[in-house]
């Protein structure tokens, strides 16, 4: 396994592999790797000869300084895990390398619509930061395929559209969420939880499953479902951030044409902001316009 901090050195090595006809897969991460990340690496291995993993805590996508400062950084442990997966190349740039003129003078990439709705509405600039850094990393690595977790459902939709809109010749592969034994979605932020908080955290997934069951049972009173779900989270000591029920394909309000809905949830627990999602098939009676859906976020606080 080779580790590169310099863009030019990484590019030269990738060019060598490409001249040899090797297929390149890329897994961008922010480090503090867990089994979910390693699942992405294994999926990447299925689609390419060479796997490149980046470890970069991107300051542009954080809307709170404390969140950026608290984000766990475990480089030595990360490199050990990647070595165990026989990753060929690891890219570990500094913010100064990625943004040499600073954030204020950086050319920005933003996917209209998708970037400013749902989570993007409450975290202005977040998805612009994601799209910008992923574009830069794609340009540096020049992969044939890139793997992203489905846990970040809206982010994956944005990256898919960005790749299509900018005519990037990169196959985007979504990988299902990896969960702990108790159902909690694996996340680097889980390490911020205290022992007591960790015991309460699976309530997010359980509440999501309750919402899914309600929808599959034919309920279409989404505002009431969201209110009940928020109460369940509060009762367990979580602070609801956002709960949305949207069309899984468009992320717009569910309507008569919708065949699947996606439940998008986030909640604060201690220092951690936990997120999760689940796609659910809609029964016929649920495929109608839900006028109250636009106020879901506000109702979930």
Swiss-Prot record:
Recorded GO CC terms: cytosol
Catalytic activity, reaction form: (R)-pantoate + beta-alanine + ATP = (R)-pantothenate + AMP + diphosphate + H(+)
UniProt keywords, alphabetically: ATP-binding, Cytoplasm, Ligase, Nucleotide-binding, Pantothenate biosynthesis
Superkingdom to which the source organism belongs: Bacteria
Binding site for ATP: 30-37, 149-152, 178, 186-189
Main location: cytoplasm
Molecular function, one GO term: ATP binding
Keyword Chaperone tagged: no
Entries under InterPro entries matching the protein: Cyt_trans-like (IPR004821), Pantoate_ligase (IPR003721), Pantoate_ligase_C (IPR042176), Rossmann-like_a/b/a_fold (IPR014729)
Pathway the protein takes part in: Cofactor biosynthesis; (R)-pantothenate biosynthesis; (R)-pantothenate from (R)-pantoate and beta-alanine: step 1/1
Residues that hold beta-alanine according to the record: 61
A Gene Ontology BP annotation from the UniProt entry: pantothenate biosynthetic process
Record's subcellular location: Cytoplasm
Short name of any one Pfam family annotated for the protein: Pantoate_ligase
E.C. number(s) listed in UniProt: 6.3.2.1
Active site residues according to the UniProt entry: 37 (proton donor)
Positions with a binding annotation for (R)-pantoate: 61, 155
Family note: Belongs to the pantothenate synthetase family.
Described purpose of this protein according to its UniProt entry: Catalyzes the condensation of pantoate with beta-alanine in an ATP-dependent reaction via a pantoyl-adenylate intermediate.
PANTHER family: CYTIDYLATE KINASE/PANTOATE-BETA-ALANINE LIGASE, PANTOATE--BETA-ALANINE LIGASE
Subunit structure, interactors included: Homodimer.
Note: The reaction proceeds by a bi uni uni bi ping pong mechanism.
Protein name in the entry: Pantothenate synthetase
Source species of the chain: Vibrio vulnificus (strain CMCP6)
């Amino acid at each position: 396994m080779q580790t590169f901090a310099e863009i030019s050195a990484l590019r030269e090595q990738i060019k060598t592999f490409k001249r040899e006809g090797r297929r390149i897969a890329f897994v961008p991460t922010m480090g503090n790797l867990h089994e979910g990340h390693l699942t992405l690496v294994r999926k990447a291995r299925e689609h390419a000869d060479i796997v490149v993993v980046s470890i970069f805590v991107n300051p542009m996508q954080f809307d709170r300084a404390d969140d950026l400062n608290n984000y766990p950084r475990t480089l030595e442990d990360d490199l050990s895990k990647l070595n165990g997966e026989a990753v060929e190349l690891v890219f570990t740039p500094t913010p100064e390398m990625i943004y040499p003129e600073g954030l204020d003078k950086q050319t920005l990439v933003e996917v209209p619509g998708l970037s400013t709705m749902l989570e993007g509405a409450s975290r202005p600039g977040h998805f612009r930061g994601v799209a910008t850094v992923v574009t830069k990393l794609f340009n540096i690595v020049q992969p044939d395929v890139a793997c992203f977790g489905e846990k970040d459902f809206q982010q994956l939709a944005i990256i898919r559209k960005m790749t299509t809109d900018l005519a990037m010749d990169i196959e985007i592969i979504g990988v299902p969420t990896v969960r702990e034994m108790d159902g909690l979605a694996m996340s680097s932020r889980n390490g911020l939880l205290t022992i007591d908080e960790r015991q309460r955290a699976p309530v997010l997934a359980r509440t999501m499953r309750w919402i899914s069951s309600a929808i599959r049972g034919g309920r279409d009173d989404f505002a009431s479902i969201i209110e009940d779900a928020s109460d369940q989270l509060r009762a367990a000591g979580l602070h609801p951030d956002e709960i949305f029920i949207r069309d899984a394909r468009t992320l717009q309000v569910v309507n008569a044409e919708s065949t699947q809905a996606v439940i998008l949830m986030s909640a604060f627990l201690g220092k951690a902001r936990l997120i999760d999602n689940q796609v659910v098939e809609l029964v016929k009676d649920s495929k109608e316009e839900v006028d109250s859906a636009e106020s879901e976020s506000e109702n979930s606080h």
